Structure formats: structure tokens, C-alpha cells
């Protein structure tokens, strides 16, 4: 970094107690790079700071910002004039620090605007992603659609031109110490401006969390080239749409839908639920889980279950399941869902279809779902 360059913010993820690493430097991903080496290189290119700020002091300041969850603002006297050190924590849903962002430079220089970032937690037991209200600052999100917990299927449904679903599911459903992923996604769902997010994930299996901690950085840029699905994906999806075929990835051992491969089945309420497992009737979940061993051996399996509908009741639904090829964990299956004839109308776009039977407690975020249904795009953004 020369004296004429604008120093970027450095994002250091703190997703596990035992490790810290660099998630990004400015707009560029760093893929869990060694944070002390990165800081030493930055300081070496800023001689005034290198001469006045000891590496140990900088490390202590970063750890203090993480442990105390507070901003750090220091002004350092150097031979080239005063220099500034700024550290900002990135908070998750429990007020824990999921990352710290650091900027160093001349006190007279312009500090770049700090893009939005937020922490999230994947809880394996509930199969939900917990997110704080700060997630509404991410491009592509809105306060009207924000909920404190969401399923992984809902996250996948909001992103386009993404092909690493199996890797993500493997980490989330079989968390092992040391497992990590970093990737970028385009969020295209809803009425908001499309956003570009960089997501860093570390698996956790400890007293605090069984699942994973996430860091989501908003890296949306006006100069970002558009991402388009392949002709093959567009063609296959349109063929399934016209044929009325509905395919999903189902976690058989946990009786939940993880991802829609086609348009979601319109008679099934799968989104904005407090608990993703509520998509299937409680008495049918055990029957679905019992198919795991059979699928692991490579066989197909069929079962009829009661799937939650938008009227608050259940619609009989036939599932034809077969193993997902090449997936390392046994619980992942491809399911074809077919509606068994009944007199319950399917959800119609644009109408107030949400109902809660009298005397029944809500099972999901009905207001946010109604907002989504009223503003959803004419075509699904998922490919």
C-alpha cells in the first residue's frame, strides 16, 4: 500500500473460539488466510505504522475488540503524522462477535465506508439459521421479510446461479471441528435490489453450538457482472414447471426439506415456519426417518405423508425418494412430491391464502409470509 492508496478494511472472522482468520481484504475474499501474516504484510506496506505500532499491541487490540465486543479507536503518533487504528465488531444473533473489521491509515486519510456485515448461527437441533435484526442492512433483505430464524431451504431459495448446495449441507448436517467454507451468492428474491453476499462458515460441535457459525458480508457492487443460469438449467426447470413436477432435497433422518430443485410444490407450506420439521405431520416424520437405512443401501422408497398446507391443515402427499448420488452423508435424498387428490385448493398467487384454524397457535411467521406472497416475483429466482 502506497501513501496515495486508500487502505481497505480487513475482515477477520472469529467464528470459533480457537481460531481467527482473514475472510476478506476490502472487496477481495481471502478464504481463511492466516490473519497475523496478513496484518504484518499490511503494516510492512505502511512504514509509519510499522515503526510505531508493535504487532503484539495490534493483536491485543483485535482480541480485546472480540472479547469485549466493543469498538476500538486509537490515534498513534508517527514520524509521518498521526495515524488511526479502527476496529469494529460484527455481531451475531446472541450478541457474540462473529468477526472484527480493522482499518489502519493516516488520520488525515478518508476511511472507506464500512459495508454491512452480520453474524448468523446454524443450529442443527432445530435446523434453523438464527439471524439478528442487523441482517436487514444486507442488500437484498428487507425489514418486512425479516424473521429471527429461517430454514436452510429458505436461504437456498433466495439465491441464484449457485451449485455448492451439497457441500453446504454436508457441513451443516455433519459438523466436524475444522470444517469450513467460504463462497459468494447472489440474492435475487423479493422486491429488493439484488445483493451479493460473501458467506464464511465454520462448523462447531461444542457446548455453545452444535452446528455452525456464519459470517455474511455484503459485497454488492454496481460493477458486479450479472450471473445467469446455464441454458441447461433454465430448460430443465421450465420443463419441470410445465409438467407440474416438484422435486426437493429431503433430510430423511431429520424429516425436513433442505432445498427445492424445482419450483416449490404450491400446496405445501414449507417456508416461514418456526420449526422446519412442521412441514410434515408429526406422526409421519417417524415413517420418513425410517427410510434412511433403505436409501443408504441405494434403494428407492415411497411413502405417503401429510404435508402442511397454507390453510393450516394437511394435504396427503406422495413422496418417491432415491439417494442423492455422490453425497457423503446418508440422510440426503431426492424426493419427487405428488399431491394426492383432495378438496383443498392450492395456493393462488396474490390472494390471502393464509389461515390459522380457530384455537390453533401460529406455527410460523404469517405476517412476513403474507408480505412475501404479495410481492413475490412472477418467476422463481432459484436455479
Question: Language model features by range: what are they?
Answer:
Residues 341-382:
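Short, charged, intrinsically disordered terminal tails
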Residues 1-46, 104-153, 226-277, 364-380:
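PAS-family sensory domain signal
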Residues 41-226, 267-351:
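Sensory/regulatory domains in signal-transduction proteins
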Amino acid at each position: 500500500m502506497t501513501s496515495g492508496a486508500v487502505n481497505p478494511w480487513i475482515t477477520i472472522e472469529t467464528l470459533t473460539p480457537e481460531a481467527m482468520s482473514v475472510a476478506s481484504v476490502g472487496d477481495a475474499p481471502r478464504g481463511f488466510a492466516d490473519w497475523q501474516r496478513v496484518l504484518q504484510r499490511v503494516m510492512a506496506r505502511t512504514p509509519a505504522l510499522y515503526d510505531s505500532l508493535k504487532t503484539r499491541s495490534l493483536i491485543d487490540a483485535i482480541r480485546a475488540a472480540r472479547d469485549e465486543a466493543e469498538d476500538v479507536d486509537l490515534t498513534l503518533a508517527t514520524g509521518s503524522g498521526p495515524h488511526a487504528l479502527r476496529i469494529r465488531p460484527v455481531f451475531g444473533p446472541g450478541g457474540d462477535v462473529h468477526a472484527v473489521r480493522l482499518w489502519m491509515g493516516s488520520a488525515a486519510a478518508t476511511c472507506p465506508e464500512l459495508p454491512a456485515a452480520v453474524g448468523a448461527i446454524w443450529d442443527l437441533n432445530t435446523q434453523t439459521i438464527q439471524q439478528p435484526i442487523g441482517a436487514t442492512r444486507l442488500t437484498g433483505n428487507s425489514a418486512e421479510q425479516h424473521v429471527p430464524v429461517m430454514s436452510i431451504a429458505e436461504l437456498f431459495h433466495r439465491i441464484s446461479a449457485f451449485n455448492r448446495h451439497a457441500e453446504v449441507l454436508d457441513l451443516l448436517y455433519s459438523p466436524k471441528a475444522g470444517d469450513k467454507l467460504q463462497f459468494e451468492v447472489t440474492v435475487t428474491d423479493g422486491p429488493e435490489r439484488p445483493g451479493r453476499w460473501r458467506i464464511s462458515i465454520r462448523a462447531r460441535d461444542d457446548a455453545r453450538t452444535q452446528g455452525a457459525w456464519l459470517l455474511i458480508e455484503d459485497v454488492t457492487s454496481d460493477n458486479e457482472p450479472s450471473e445467469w443460469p446455464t441454458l441447461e438449467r433454465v430448460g430443465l426447470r421450465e420443463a419441470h414447471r410445465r409438467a407440474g413436477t416438484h422435486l426437493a432435497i429431503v433430510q430423511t433422518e431429520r424429516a425436513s426439506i433442505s432445498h427445492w430443485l424445482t419450483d416449490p410444490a404450491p400446496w405445501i407450506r414449507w417456508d416461514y415456519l418456526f420449526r422446519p420439521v412442521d412441514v410434515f405431520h408429526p406422526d409421519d416424520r417417524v415413517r420418513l426417518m425410517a427410510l434412511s437405512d433403505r436409501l443408504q443401501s441405494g434403494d428407492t422408497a415411497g411413502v405417503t405423508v401429510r404435508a402442511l398446507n397454507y390453510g393450516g391443515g394437511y394435504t396427503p402427499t406422495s413422496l418417491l425418494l432415491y439417494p442423492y448420488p455422490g453425497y457423503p452423508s446418508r440422510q440426503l435424498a431426492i424426493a419427487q412430491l405428488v399431491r394426492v387428490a383432495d378438496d383443498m385448493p392450492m395456493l393462488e398467487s396474490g390472494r390471502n391464502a393464509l389461515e390459522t384454524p380457530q384455537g390453533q397457535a401460529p406455527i410460523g411467521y404469517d405476517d412476513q409470509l403474507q408480505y412475501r406472497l404479495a410481492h413475490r416475483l412472477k418467476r422463481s429466482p432459484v436455479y
